């Protein structure tokens, strides 16, 4: 049933928009909860310009106000207001809300990159590609966009696995154990349990994750049951990682792309 549902491009994109919308909603709520972390001076990382002065445009008062605490507050509030309109799929407002949400998301990301994770980067790519697609494509549910998203997800998995494969401490489980302990400071009992776990278990888990990620490029070519096993690995990885590391938007963003893999898999096997 799921396979048949996601064989339609419109269903895939609608699912993606809902999950990305939820991810952005959670991200904005997290920004509002941590709004006091932003100063009143505008926290754009000026050192990115590799200069000892701020360019005239950036030094302008209006520009700087966008990036200060009040600016961040109102941008996140505006994004929260726009997201339901975007998710509900109102045809008249869809393109306008998508444009505004994309613009807000990129500006918020630039302003608070230190608070962002891989999900925020992927959200930027998803929204930008979706906006370009709706602007230039004659058909709202063009499969080429779904193929792009499926490729994006596979590249994300594969590159992550390849980087881990080249790191000895990832292969032997040391980094995995360190990440699980240091990112769970809010769960003292869990930290105590994790510290007591034998490092060999982390080694095996780490190697399974690396193997799954490195071989992820084969997913669209795998037969039914093996393909669904890989999908289960993907979903489990995002759920467990998101829960343990408190990456709330991470769960929604990457899960949003899984139907794109299902669609790609279905189209490949339909041609065989």
What is the role of each PLM region?
Residues 1-272:
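Alpha-helical membrane-anchoring segments
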């Amino acid at each position: 049933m799921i396979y048949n549902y996601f064989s339609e491009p419109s269903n895939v994109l609608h699912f993606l928009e809902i999950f990305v919308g939820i991810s952005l909603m959670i991200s904005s709520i997290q920004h509002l909860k941590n709004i006091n972390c932003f100063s009143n001076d505008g926290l754009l990382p000026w050192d990115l310009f590799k200069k000892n002065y701020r360019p005239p445009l950036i030094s302008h008062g209006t520009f700087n106000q966008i990036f200060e605490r009040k600016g961040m507050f109102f941008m996140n509030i505006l994004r929260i207001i726009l997201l339901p309109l975007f998710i509900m799929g109102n045809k008249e407002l869809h393109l306008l809300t998508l444009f505004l949400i994309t613009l807000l998301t990129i500006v918020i990301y630039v302003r608070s990159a230190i608070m962002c994770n891989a999900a925020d980067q992927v959200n930027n790519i998803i929204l930008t590609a979706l906006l370009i697609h709706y602007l230039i494509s004659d058909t709202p549910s063009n499969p080429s966009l779904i193929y792009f998203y499926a490729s994006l997800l596979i590249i994300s998995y594969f590159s992550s696995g390849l980087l881990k494969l080249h790191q000895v401490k990832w292969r032997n489980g040391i980094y995995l154990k360190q990440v699980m302990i240091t990112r769970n400071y809010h769960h003292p009992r869990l930290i105590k349990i994790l510290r007591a776990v034998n490092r060999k278990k982390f080694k095996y888990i780490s190697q399974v994750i690396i193997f799954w990620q490195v071989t992820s490029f084969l997913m669209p070519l795998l037969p039914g049951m093996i393909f669904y096993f890989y999908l289960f690995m993907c979903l489990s990885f995002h759920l467990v990682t998101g829960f343990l590391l408190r990456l709330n938007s991470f769960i929604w963003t990457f899960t949003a792309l899984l139907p794109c893999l299902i669609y790609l898999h279905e189209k490949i096997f339909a041609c065989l």
